[in-house]
Structures are given as structure tokens and as C-alpha cells.
UniProtKB/Swiss-Prot annotation:
Signal peptide range in chain numbering: none
Name the record gives this protein: Antimicrobial peptide 2
Subunit structure: Monomer.
Keywords from the named record: Antimicrobial, Plant defense, Secreted
Highest taxon in the source lineage: Eukaryota
Keyword Secreted: yes
The keyword Secreted is annotated on this UniProt entry: yes
Tissue: Found in the liquid endosperm contained in green fruit of coconut palms, also known as coconut water (at protein level).
Record-level GO BP terms: defense response to Gram-negative bacterium; defense response to Gram-positive bacterium
GO CC terms of this entry: extracellular space
Species of origin: Cocos nucifera
Localization terms from the record: Secreted, Extracellular space
Disulfide bonds: none
Function: Has antimicrobial activity against Gram-positive bacteria B.subtilis (MIC=150 ug/ml) and S.aureus (MIC=170 ug/ml), and against Gram-negative bacteria E.coli (MIC=170 ug/ml) and P.aeruginosa (MIC=169 ug/ml).
Amino acid sequence: TESYFVFSVGM
């Protein structure tokens, strides 16, 4: 899962 990617989008 691209959790880090989703986190970046959340920022």
C-alpha cells in the first residue's frame, strides 16, 4: 500500500 503517497496528498 502506498501509505506514504496518501500521506503526502493529505499534506
